[in-house]
Amino acid sequence: MAYRNTVCTPQVIDLETEQGHSHIHSESFNRTGNDSSDQGAQHAVRGVGNATNIGLSDMRSYYDAGMNHPHQPVHNLPPNLGVDSGFVFPSSMYNPCMSTTSMNQYVSHTQSFGLPSNQVVLGSMDEGSRNENAGESARGFIKRKNAAVAGSYHCANGFASSSSSHASLNPTHRPWDPSFESNVLPNTASYNPSEYHSQTSWPSMEGSSIPSNGFNLMGAHPESAQHGNYAFPTSHISQCFQPTSNTWISQSANGIADGIPQWEYVNGMNNAPGRFSRSGMTETVNGSFREYQNGPSTLCRGPLPYFHQHAGMHAHNLLDHTQVQAPYQQCHNNPVLHGVNHSGNRFHLGPRIPVLFSNSERTFGPPHHPLLANPVNHRNIRILPPEHATIMDFSRLYEVSNVVDEHRDMRLDIDSMTYEELLALEEQIGDVNTGLAKSYIVEKLKTSLFVPGSSCMSNKSSESSMENDACIICQEEYQVKECIGTLDCGHRYHEDCIKQWLMVKNLCPICKTTALSTGRRSG
């Protein structure tokens, strides 16, 4: 079986560009052995210091188990060797993560940028299994300290300043070397271990960052240390991962249980953590979903998170709009919340990712909206004021009260009413006098004697007179020489019947016209 030593040095992101994209440089990427994708190849793990490589065969067996089953947790993990073995994993397989508090004892997960062309600086772990990364950028100098406890622990990291530390399990050793307290490392000599096969130093933004005594120099943004952190798997990023596809590394499901470190090995191409950064005055967004806090010997390993392959998310204004996927967040035994800090990072994250509080203050993220395929330019969005918005007309709703007809009593159907109902209605309405006076009727009404065969019995003929044989009011026929009254329209009635009628109304019962005019006198 072929063996291969893979050396991937730590990676640095240049955050001082003004174009909005992070420039990542790579000066050297040394690899020995066969570089082809060989699933049967094994990685050699070398101990640091005077420690012997005890139990490497067991590690290889677990390594192969993780290769064959990349997403299944390893239940029987190798025990602590009890010696200062200080296994050094290839540095490209992990990157130091940010520690949110100075009380963290161990950070179990690792990171890798997974981006092409990386700016790299060399470094290794010393005999005390400690590591330090310090760097300078265009805006200032920051120092990065990494320390790991003695034994099979790989380094736990700090980022903000020297106050971010990790206590060693051996109280006899000092947690930090006095040389760590310096913020400037002038005239440092180049120290490149032979096993790293390095050729030269890797430059940062303003000169060269030269490692010395197993400490790494790393250029980073000075303002990035004050913001929350998170990471997504680089397998869901559009950029490629530099190592070959058969790279197997310790993933984010690592933890500590009863003082013994526990690892799970997963294919680096399938579930390699990555780091996202933003340039300019914005902040670095780094970290991990599996970052444990405030847990002295209470951290327990958990299962690997399950990543949905079809739930895409878009990070706006981030490395050419990189498309990432939102992982499913599982619960941990640690009572501290894990997740993402929405402090100005413009990541529109889904509601499945909780919030990681780095301090006692509670932060609230922006409301979750439906994600768009392309980033929206918020400057071009026009928000109308309330007075310009569409107003609904609710006037029809208030017309319901007018459904009741206030004049319904005046719209009675008298044609279907009985006589008793008409009398009752007459009593309610009262007497309405539109007729003529009796004296006026006697004066104006034309009278005559009925003679059968003659159309008119009066002295003055009338063209409008009409001959009828019966009175329409009393419905009786006229008798010979009976007195008949004639109206102006020519209709004839009994004298007594028409007088009573005219006293009620001055209308002809047949044609409904004016019965007697006020300007004429009877002759």
Curated annotation (Swiss-Prot):
Compositional bias annotation for Basic and acidic residues: 18-28
Known catalytic reactions: S-ubiquitinyl-[E2 ubiquitin-conjugating enzyme]-L-cysteine + [acceptor protein]-L-lysine = [E2 ubiquitin-conjugating enzyme]-L-cysteine + N(6)-ubiquitinyl-[acceptor protein]-L-lysine
InterPro entries for the chain: MBR1/2-like, Znf_RING, Znf_RING/FYVE/PHD
Enzyme class: transferase
SUPFAM superfamilies, per database record: RING/U-box (SSF57850)
An example Gene Ontology molecular-function term: zinc ion binding
Region named Disordered: 18-43
Biological processes per GO annotation: protein ubiquitination
Pfam families: zf-RING_2
Cross-referenced PROSITE patterns: ZF_RING_2 (PS50089)
Biochemical pathway: Protein modification; protein ubiquitination
Keyword annotations: Metal-binding, Transferase, Ubl conjugation pathway, Zinc, Zinc-finger
Function: Probable E3 ubiquitin-protein ligase.
Quaternary assembly: Interacts with DJA6.
Domain free text: The RING-type zinc finger domain mediates binding to an E2 ubiquitin-conjugating enzyme.
Family: Belongs to the RING-type zinc finger family.
Name of this chain's protein: Probable E3 ubiquitin-protein ligase ZFP1
Gene from which the chain derives: ZFP1
